[in-house]
C-alpha cells in the first residue's frame, strides 16, 4: 500500500514516512502548547481561551489546583485552578494528564462554583477526561504542606510561600513511589483503602500533630470514585489515537511558568513539577515530535507571587502603580503580586529551554500611563556582565540590572483592536521586544476580555 493511502497496521490509516535511518515514523496531528514565560500569572488563560474556541481537545499536563487562570466570556469571569480552562468550549474535550495531581474535593468544588456563574460549564462532567495515571492529592497532603511551611518559618525564618494545596507533598509521595493514582481509586477499593491507610500512617509518623480522619476520608473518596469513574481513561492510548487519527486541534495549557519549573526555575522558590516544554511530553505521554507550536505568554512587565529573587522588582511608586493598575493579586491565594520591569535576560533563558515559536504579550495597557518604560537587558555582578541567568539564588539576589529606557505613550490603548491603531511608541516597545528576543509576537493583550487580544499574524 502506498504512503498516500495509509499503511496497514497503523491506527486510523496513519501515514508512515521513511526517515534517513530507514525507520518508519508516524506523521499525525501535533499539539499546540501555551506556556508561561516568567513567574506565572502572565495571562495564559486568555490565550488558551482564544485558541480553545477551535480546539477539539484541551489538555493540562502538570501541576494541580495551585495554578490559577481567569477567563472572561460573555462578561462572566470564570476562575480555574485544576480544570483546563478550555472546558468552557462545549465542543471540546478537557483532558487532565498523568503529570497533573488531583485533589478531588477541589475539582468538584471548582466546577460547581463556576457552574453558578454562567452557562460555560454546563455538562462539564461529560466533557472531562482524566488520565488513569494521574496522582491523587489527599487532604493530609494539604495539611502537611501547611505544617512544612510553618516549620520552615520557625527554623529558617522564611518559608517557600506555597499555596498550601498539597502539591509538594503529593509529588514527594509520587517520587517516593508511595502515592496513589486514579487507576487505583477506580479499581479495587479495598486494595486502595489498605494503601491509603499505609500512606496516612507514614504521614502521621512524619508529622505527629497531623490529624487524619481515615474512615471519614475513605468514605468521601468512595463517593468521589463513583462520580469520577466515567471520566477516567488510559491517557496514553487516548492521546495516541487523537494524535494519529483524523485531523484534530489539540491544545496544551501549561500551568505555573518557566521560572517556577522544579529544574529550571529559581529553586527552591519554585513549584514541584516541570512547567517547561519537557513537562508536556512526560505529563501527557506523548513524544517530542508530536509537539508543534510552543507559545510563550509574557506580561509587558514582570510580576512574582511570594518570596525569591526578582532582579527587576520595583519597591517604589512604579511597582505600586503596576500592582494597582494591573490588579495584581493571585487568583489562588489572593496574595499581592510583586511588580517590576520587563526582564529580557529572564525571557532569553526561558526561550532557551522552551524554544518558543511565538509570544503573546499581555497587559500592554497597564503601561499606558507611563512617560518612560525601562527594560532589563543584562545582569552584572561586581561590575562585570554575566552571560547567563544564574542558577544560584544568592548570586541572582546580588545581580545589578542594566536597563534600556524607552519612551512611553501616555495614551489609553484599551479599545485598540489592531496593531496599526496602537500609539507609535507602543508599537516601538513591541518591536523592540521582538528584536531583542528574536521571537515574533503573535498577540498583544490590552484588556481583560477575549476581544481585547490583538492578533498580529
From Swiss-Prot:
Its cofactor is Mg(2+). Pfam families: Adenylsucc_synt (PF00709). InterPro entries: Adenylosuccin_syn_GTP-bd (IPR018220), Adenylosuccin_syn_Lys_AS (IPR033128), Adenylosuccinate_synth_dom1 (IPR042109), Adenylosuccinate_synth_dom2 (IPR042110), Adenylosuccinate_synth_dom3 (IPR042111), Adenylosuccinate_synthetase (IPR001114), AdSS_2_vert (IPR027529), P-loop_NTPase (IPR027417). It is found in: Cytoplasm; Mitochondrion. The keyword GTP-binding applies. Mg(2+) binds at residues 41, 68. It catalyses: IMP + L-aspartate + GTP = N(6)-(1,2-dicarboxyethyl)-AMP + GDP + phosphate + 2 H(+). Its main location: cytoplasm. GTP binds at residues 40-46, 68-70, 337, 363-365, 445-448. This is Adenylosuccinate synthetase isozyme 2 B. It comes from Xenopus tropicalis (Western clawed frog).
Amino acid at each position: 500500500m502506498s504512503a498516500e493511502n495509509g499503511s496497514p497496521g497503523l491506527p486510523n490509516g496513519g501515514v508512515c514516512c521513511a526517515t534517513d535511518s530507514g525507520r518508519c515514523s508516524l506523521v499525525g496531528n501535533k499539539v499546540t502548547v501555551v506556556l508561561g514565560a516568567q513567574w506565572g500569572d502572565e495571562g495564559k488563560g486568555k490565550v488558551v481561551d482564544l485558541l480553545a474556541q477551535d480546539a477539539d481537545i484541551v489538555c493540562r499536563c502538570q501541576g494541580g489546583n495551585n495554578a490559577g487562570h481567569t477567563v472572561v466570556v460573555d462578561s462572566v469571569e470564570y476562575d480555574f485552578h485544576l480544570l483546563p480552562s478550555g472546558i468552557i468550549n462545549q465542543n471540546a474535550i478537557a483532558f487532565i494528564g498523568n503529570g497533573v495531581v488531583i485533589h478531588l474535593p477541589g475539582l468538584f468544588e471548582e466546577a460547581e462554583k463556576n457552574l453558578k456563574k454562567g452557562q460555560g460549564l454546563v455538562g462539564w462532567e461529560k466533557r472531562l477526561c482524566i488520565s488513569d495515571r494521574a496522582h491523587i492529592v489527599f487532604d493530609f497532603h494539604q495539611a502537611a504542606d501547611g505544617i512544612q511551611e510553618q516549620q520552615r518559618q520557625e527554623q529558617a525564618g522564611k518559608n517557600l510561600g506555597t499555596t498550601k494545596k498539597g502539591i509538594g507533598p503529593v509529588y514527594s509521595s509520587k517520587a517516593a513511589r508511595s502515592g496513589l493514582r486514579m487507576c487505583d481509586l477506580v479499581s479495587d477499593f479495598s486494595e486502595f483503602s489498605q494503601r491509603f491507610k499505609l500512606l496516612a500512617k507514614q504521614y502521621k509518623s512524619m508529622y505527629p500533630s497531623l490529624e487524619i480522619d481515615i474512615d471519614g476520608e475513605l468514605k468521601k473518596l468512595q463517593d468521589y470514585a463513583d462520580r469520577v469513574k466515567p471520566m477516567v481513561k488510559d491517557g496514553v492510548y487516548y492521546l495516541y489515537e487523537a494524535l494519529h487519527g483524523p485531523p484534530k486541534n489539540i491544545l496544551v495549557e501549561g500551568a505555573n511558568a518557566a521560572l517556577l519549573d522544579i529544574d529550571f526555575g529559581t529553586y527552591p522558590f519554585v513549584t514541584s513539577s516541570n512547567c517547561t516544554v519537557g513537562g508536556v511530553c512526560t505529563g501527557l505521554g506523548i513524544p517530542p515530535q508530536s509537539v508543534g507550536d510552543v507559545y510563550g505568554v509574557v506580561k509587558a512587565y514582570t510580576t512574582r507571587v511570594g518570596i525569591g529573587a526578582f532582579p527587576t522588582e520595583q519597591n517604589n511608586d512604579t511597582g505600586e502603580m503596576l500592582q494597582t493598575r494591573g490588579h495584581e493579586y493571585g487568583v489562588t491565594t489572593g496574595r499581592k503580586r510583586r511588580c517590576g520591569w520587563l526582564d529580557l535576560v529572564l525571557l532569553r533563558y526561558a526561550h532557551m529551554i522552551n524554544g518558543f515559536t511565538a509570544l503573546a504579550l499581555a497587559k500592554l495597557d497597564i503601561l499606558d500611563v507611563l512617560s518612560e518604560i525601562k527594560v532589563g537587558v543584562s545582569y552584572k555582578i561586581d561590575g562585570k556582565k554575566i552571560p547567563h541567568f544564574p542558577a544560584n539564588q544568592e548570586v541572582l539576589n546580588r545581580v545589578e540590572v542594566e536597563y534600556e529606557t524607552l519612551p512611553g505613550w501616555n495614551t489609553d490603548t484599551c479599545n485598540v483592536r489592531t496593531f496599526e491603531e496602537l500609539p507609535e511608541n507602543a508599537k516601538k516597545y513591541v518591536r523592540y521586544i521582538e528584536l531583542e528576543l528574536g521571537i515574533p509576537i503573535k498577540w498583544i493583550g490590552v484588556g481583560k476580555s477575549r476581544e481585547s487580544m490583538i492578533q498580529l499574524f
